[in-house]
Each structure stands twice: as structure tokens, then as C-alpha cells.
Amino acid sequence: IGRAVQQECRVYILDSRANLYSFSLNGKKEWVLDLAPILEKNQKTHHSGGIALNQENLFVATGFGEIFSIKLDGSINWKKRFDSPFRGAPIFSNNKIFVLNANDLAIALNKNGETIWTLQGATRPTLLSKGVSPAAKSNKLLLPFSAGQLKAVRPNNGAQIWKVAFDQSNKGEAYSIIGDFGGSPVIKSNKVFLVSSSGQLLALNLNSGRKIWSVLVGSNSTPVINGGSIFVVSTNGQLVRIDENNGEVIWSRNISGSTSSNEKFFGPTLAGNFLWITGTDGYLRKFDPSTGKEFSKHRIGNQILYRTYAVHDKLFIITKSGKIIAFD
């Protein structure tokens, strides 16, 4: 299941069979649209795909290699098929749709579904099927490829501005690659933050790609940045707070209270001035962003494989079985 998106009083979710759901905030299912190809109905895909939106349309990339433009009432404007599944959600920026497929092809489309440009990125076989998305700001489009390489390109034509990769610091360019992206790149002010599954968090200058700092923290989730701090759920089960400016670790807390836990954790999500973390142990945990202290934990009773989503004054949790639970 990909990341939920919200538009006014509706939440849209894409599942592993390419069913697109529209829910009201009170949990009422308004409509469902089966986007799977005819010959692949009821089959699960290993790639999550995802959803982007503007004021009028949803742009949905599926794990079956198709991308759709869909009105908010569920009617389809157009669809376009590509040769490879989409691992993550598209983004919509400057009236264009940008998305990466599992073969590391970056694709730019206009709102009518016409291809503007494509760019083949560095690729390698990976066991990770979770999706990451591009990011865009200040006439720069950031493309995270599965070989651990990030390219900054011009959104209008795909021309390269700079590129970097994990685990090398030769004057801002890098070619020694240790792992896939654990989360999507995040742009804050004039910095780019990116995290690898295999143990590195980098801060880069947005204009040049020059490395500002790095810290040995890996994650399978996109970091949260707030109030000068970066919050990361690490691959070894810790909630880590890092100084945004210099990369120093301010504190690190074991999420489960045990250093030997084999559980996996997802998040964090910042909502109501607290950090929320879900996990395969079936708990929703609430932490203080200032100190890392755990305030409470709620037993959900099902394995949770996704970070929680905050929409208005509600938290939404999706369990492994596909059940959606909302908290006020």
C-alpha cells in the first residue's frame, strides 16, 4: 500500500492490487476503482506505486507499470503504460508529472499524459521494493535512483545539474555506492537531506550538490524535519534526533525499550506536537520531540507495516491485513 494522500475532506489510498479508494474522514468509502490490467486482476504487485494530486485530478502510478489521470470523483481522464512497474508515487510540480519506475527510468509527463522527456538513471538489482519519489524546488528536480545515486536535473528537459551518491565525498561528487534510498529526498531551505537503508544520512547544498555533513544513521523511512531538527526512525530500531545544521546527534532512543528487538518500526509522523511511530509489534507509540521520551503506546492488535498519516485532526493507520484505523 502506498502513502495516502488527502484533498480537503477525502483520503485516497492505492493498495497492492492497484485498487484506488476514496474515503471520507469519517471512514465512509465513497468509491473504489480497479486500475489493474485485465489479465492481472486480483494479482498483487511487489511495487507500491503511489498517488500525486493537484486541485482537480489524481495522478496514480501503479505497480503494474501504468499511470493514470483521474478526476476526484473517480472518472478516468487518461492512462499510459510503461515497460516497468512504478516503485513509488509521482509528484506534480510546475504543471508536470514526474515519476521513477523500477528500471530507474525517470519520466516527465504533461497534464495530458504526453511524455516530455525520459532519463535513464544508474540502476542495480535491489531487494527493496518500497517506493521513493522525486522532489522539486527552485527549478531543480531531484531523482533518487536505486543504485544510491541522486541526480539534480532541469524539470523542463531533464538536463543534469549535478549528481552525488552515498559513501563518498570527493568534492561533492560520488561514485562508491553502498545502498538504496531508504526514503525520498527532502528539500528544506537550500539543503537536501537523503537517507540510505544501509546506514548514511547526508545533507547537501541544493544548488551545487556539495556535501555539508553526513552521519552514520540508516533508515527505511523519509525523515521528518521540524524546528531545526531531523527526526529519523533508524534501521536498528531507534528514534534519532539530529541537528539540521551540523549533523550532530542530539539524542537517540530505543523505540521498543529493548536493544534486542527484531521488530521493524515506521515513521515518524509529526502531529499534534508529538512524534508517532508504528511497528510490526502492533503498537502505535507517541514521543516527545524535545526529549525523545515515550508518552504512551496503544495496542492496535494487528501488524502495522506503514507509517501513520495525519489528516486534519486525525491519525490514520493501515494494518498488514489492509484494515484502516482512525484516531482522534
Regions found by a protein language model. Give the residues of each.
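Short loop/turn segments that connect beta-strands within beta-propeller blades
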Residues: 24-28, 71-75, 110-114, 155-158, ...
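Beta-strand-rich domains and repeat architectures in extracellular enzymes and scaffolds
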Residues: 1-17
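C-terminal closing repeat unit and adjoining cap/tail of repeat-based domains
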Residues: 274, 279-322, 328
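Loop/turn-rich, solvent-exposed surfaces of beta-rich toroidal or solenoidal domains
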Residues: 229-241, 248, 252-286
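Extracytoplasmic beta-rich repeat domains
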Residues: 1-5, 30-52, 76-92, 115-138, ...
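Structural signature of WD-repeat beta-propellers
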Residues: 15-16, 62-63, 101-102, 145-146, ...
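Conserved beta-propeller blade signature
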Residues: 10-13, 21, 57-60, 97-99, ...
